[in-house]
Curated annotation (Swiss-Prot):
It comes from Haemophilus influenzae (strain PittGG). [2Fe-2S] cluster binds at residues 73, 79, 82, 114. Keywords: 2Fe-2S, Cell inner membrane, Cell membrane, FAD, Flavoprotein, Ion transport, Iron, Iron-sulfur, Membrane, Metal-binding, NAD, Sodium, Sodium transport, Translocase, Transmembrane, Transmembrane helix, Transport, Ubiquinone. GO terms for molecular function: 2 iron, 2 sulfur cluster binding; electron transfer activity; metal ion binding; oxidoreductase activity, acting on NAD(P)H, quinone or similar compound as acceptor. InterPro entries: 2Fe-2S_ferredoxin-like_sf, 2Fe-2S_ferredoxin-type, Beta-grasp_dom_sf, Cbr1-like_FAD-bd_dom, FAD-bd_FR_type, Flavoprot_Pyr_Nucl_cyt_Rdtase, FNR_nucleotide-bd, NqrF. This is Na(+)-translocating NADH-quinone reductase subunit F. CDD domains: NADH_quinone_reductase.
Length: 411
């Protein structure tokens, strides 16, 4: 057999092998890679069914059709908010979901929408209130410091639009890839001391992807045409100075009047109960936001006659905000009082009010001698340490879980 024949046979054999491998790959791709359109049936309602190309996650698939499921972490699987019921399709539950979904819930079909792959036709069940969630492009009215590490972001809703939220609710705010230099922040001179002390100006936040985070609203329903947030800058902890700063808080702090911001909502479950029970509000830091929303709503819109008090913890006098507003509400409403406790008062504060941590102040100066603390409703929002301390104190007083309402976003 000549060399040319051997060469030709070799080339032919190689070509056949390549073609076989290509055929195998294409077959595998047809089985493993999502392709074609699929249908997601929602709430057994043909009018709610959506059709779209296979691929991606359920959270994104729903959002692409204008159905916005709450996800404070932006689909990272860490917040556990995007729980939906998958009745058919979606595959097996993933290990990443089990920290948010117990065995009973998993058996009933509950899943994290951000973790469910959309590969074929599905049947899901969503809360009806989700269909009232919309998306808006808002305009920044102002973005001012209210404390050393807290800004009040005020957004204008598009003219003619309305965000039909309830007091205690929240919205999600979005940001595209960006770079934020802390040295460019507009911070009044009175707050520079701590920024200089910890050299916070050196930080840079670089974000390479679209992000979404949730923030409780400080505004209340009667404040028409605006959304107001209290946003604490998430700087790296002192023990980890080289850790990256908070992505969304850095972005929000960089916003200036006239900038455009995309939000979606309303969401929420931190709502006031419709009872006559006494209301005790406990807040700290940016946890002020839902406290303001609730208290303003109760006293200004509902004209509630329920007995209520507000206990707010701050480091020093400089960290107190909305003081004039709450002083006025206290003067105008016999059923409302509010108190501030400073945990680290400065000499120049000349502070004569309560000092210490707010859970201790609340207990020693009110609940210890309250005739029935277990009958009150407690609404709280603040740093995790504060929340844990308050909950323990309330449990020790015999308060049942149903009367302890916690907003995890504000701190």
């Amino acid at each position: 057999m000549s060399d040319s024949v051997i060469l030709a046979l070799g080339i032919a054999a190689f070509t056949v092998i390549v073609l076989v491998l290509v055929a195998i790959i294409l077959f595998a791709k047809s089985k493993l890679v999502d392709s074609g359109d699929i249908t997601i049936d929602i709430n057994d309602d043909p009018e709610k069914a959506i059709t779209l190309p296979a691929g991606g996650k359920l959270l994104g698939a729903l959002a692409s059709k204008g159905i916005f499921v709450s996800s404070a972490c932006g689909g990272g699987g860490s917040c556990g908010q995007c729980i939906v019921k998958v009745k058919n399709g979606g595959g097996e539950i993933l290990p990443t979901e089990l920290s948010h979904i117990n065995k009973r819930e998993a058996k009933e079909g509950y899943r994290l929408a951000c973790q469910v792959n959309v590969k074929g036709n599905m049947e899901v069940e969503l809360p009806e209130e989700i269909f009232g969630v919309k998306k808006w492009e808002c305009t920044v009215i102002s973005n001012d410091n209210k404390a050393t590490f807290i800004k009040e972001l005020k957004l204008a809703i598009p003219e003619g639009e309305e965000v039909p939220f309830r007091a205690g609710g929240y919205i999600q705010i979005e940001a595209e890839p960006h770079v934020v230099n802390y040295k460019d922040f507009d911070i009044p001179e009175e707050y520079h001391e701590d920024w200089d002390k910890y050299d916070l100006w050196r930080y840079v936040s670089k974000v390479d992807e679209h992000i979404i985070r949730a923030y409780s609203m400080a505004s209340y329903p009667e404040e028409k045409g605006i959304i107001m947030l209290n946003v604490r800058i998430a700087t790296p902890p002192p023990r980890q100075p080289d850790a990256p700063p908070g992505q969304m808080s850095s972005y929000i702090w960089s916003l200036k009047a006239g900038d455009k911001v995309t939000i979606s909502g309303p969401f929420g479950e931190f709502f006031a109960k419709e009872t006559d029970a006494e209301m005790v509000f406990i807040g700290g830091g940016a946890g002020m936001a839902p406290m303001r929303s609730h208290i303003f709503d109760q006293l200004k819109r509902l004209h509630s006659k329920r007995k209520m008090s507000f206990w707010y913890g701050a480091r020093s006098k400089r960290e107190i905000f909305y003081q004039e507003d709450f002083d006025q509400l206290q003067a105008e409403n016999d059923n409302f009082v509010w108190h501030v406790a400073l945990s680290d008062a400065l000499p120049e504060d000349n502070w004569t009010g309560y000092t210490g941590f707010i859970h201790n102040v609340l207990y020693e100066n009110y609940l210890k001698n309250h005739e029935a603390p277990e009958d009150c409703e407690y609404y709280m929002c603040g740093p995790p340490v504060m929340n844990a301390a308050v909950i323990k104190m309330l449990k020790d007083l015999g308060v049942e879980d149903e009367n302890i309402l916690l907003d995890d976003f504000g701190g």
